[in-house]
Structure formats: C-alpha cells, structure tokens
C-alpha cells in the first residue's frame, strides 16, 4: 500500500527475480496526483540499484506514461485485457487433414517452448532471450504458478509429417477463479489456415462444457490476434497498460 500521512493513496508490488527488479500492480487514487507516480518511479529505481539489479521492468496503466518516460524507461509493448462469453455460436471449421489437435500434456513442455519462441520471434511478445526462458514459462503455467492449470481446455496441434515441431498450441488456467487463455500460438508456416481460431474455439467450447461462462485473456495491441479475438466476441475489459524496461547503472 502507498500512504500519504495516514491516508492510503494507492498500491503496488515490487519484487526481484534474478538480475531484474519488477514493479507492477500500480494503482493510484485520482487525488494522489502525478507527483506520487513520479515518486514511485524514483523510489523503485533507488531500491533496484541498492539490490544491485541490472534492470527494472515495470507494468503500469497508460495514465502514468509521462512519469516513467521522464526517467528513461523504454516501452516494450502495450497490452489490454479482454473478456468473452464461452457460449459462442461459431462452428469449428475443418482443418487441413495433415493437422491433428489433441489435449496437451507435460511431455509437450519443450516443444511448446520451441513453438512460442518461433511464433513470437521478431515481435513485441518475444520477451525471453533464449529457449530456456520460454520452456521455463510453459512449465510454470502447467505447474499452476499462474493459477490452477486446466488441462481439459489446453491443446496442441501436430502435423503428420513433423513429429519434432508443433503447429500450434493453447493453454488455459484459472486467474482469480476465472478461466484465462494463455499463449495461443501458431507456427509461422501454419498461419492463415484457421488454426488459431480453431484452437481458441475448441478451448472456449470445452470451458462452456465444464460450466465456465466467461473467459479472459491479455493481448498486445496491434498484433493480428487482436482482430481474431474481436471476431470471437472478445471485448476490452480494462485500461491499456504498458510494459517497459530501464537499465540500472550500478
């Protein structure tokens, strides 16, 4: 919590992971004013340096752009939350006969990590510097560290002629008791055949069968998937927020 005298004016979370400090969950009451946001940024930089961290990564609402930009933060991407009903009338369109969709398992972790690295390469969602980072994130999702994993609603797509690389994948878990789609990804060579829409619809239909009426996701603004989600009935459910990074001089 953030306090002004005896009055709470906001909240945030500050923690460390490896050589990086992280600041997220920043919410300020309107009466706090822009000066409080600037103080938060300055204090986070001081604490990061005191911890000998090399980077400070921050996630914050777009309303605080000026305070972070003024201290040298470089914007990585803009994201927004979206929500949709799982009761959707669109049918599952047939896929090419060479593709097979099945429920994913822990044995798929390495291949899903490879798929995510290939799918996000060169784009704003390419957040891990190496394959190990992607595989670690997939393992964390399946192990429930983002919220209880829902295996019945998580799928991979395989190509009959390539057993070493996945064509697509989608994962789902609970976030505050609401299903969340995490990393809908399609390999570059299998785009524009309807695979992304197929996986998304399959997950939404399975969630509906399990009694979940809504599903959420977070998407980077400006990527093609944003339009896909709109077609599937997703609407923006919150403000745009920024993910940014600043190097720390220690």
Language-model segments: residues:
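Glycine-rich phosphate-binding loop
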Residues: 31, 136, 190
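Acyl-donor-binding surface of acyltransferase catalytic domains
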Residues: 29-99, 242-244
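A conserved beta-strand-loop-helix scaffold within acyl/acetyltransferase catalytic domains
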Residues: 12-19, 125-179, 184
């Amino acid at each position: 919590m953030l306090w002004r005298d005896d009055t709470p004016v906001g909240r945030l979370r500050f923690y460390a992971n490896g050589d990086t400090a992280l600041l997220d969950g920043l919410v300020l009451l309107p009466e706090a004013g822009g000066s409080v946001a600037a103080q938060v940024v300055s204090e986070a930089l001081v604490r990061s340096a005191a911890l000998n961290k090399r980077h400070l990564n921050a996630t914050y609402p777009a309303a605080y752009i000026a305070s972070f930009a003024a201290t040298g933060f470089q914007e990585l991407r803009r994201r927004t939350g979206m929500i949709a009903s799982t009761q959707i009338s669109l049918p599952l369109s047939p896929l090419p006969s060479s593709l097979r969709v099945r429920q994913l398992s822990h044995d798929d972790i390495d291949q899903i990590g490879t798929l995510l690295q290939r799918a996000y390469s060169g784009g704003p969602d390419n957040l891990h510097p190496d394959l190990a980072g992607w595989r670690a994130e997939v393992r964390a999702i399946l192990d429930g560290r983002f919220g209880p994993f829902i295996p019945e609603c998580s799928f991979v797509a395989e190509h009959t002629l390539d057993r070493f690389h996945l064509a697509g994948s989608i994962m789902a878990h609970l976030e505050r008791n609401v299903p969340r789609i995490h990393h809908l990804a399609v390999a570059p060579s299998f785009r524009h055949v309807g695979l992304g829409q197929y996986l998304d619809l399959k997950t939404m239909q399975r969630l509906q069968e399990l009694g979940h009426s809504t599903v959420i996701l977070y998407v980077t603004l400006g990527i093609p998937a944003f339009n896909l989600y709109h077609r599937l009935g997703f609407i923006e459910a919150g403000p745009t927020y920024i993910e940014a990074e600043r190097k720390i001089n220690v």
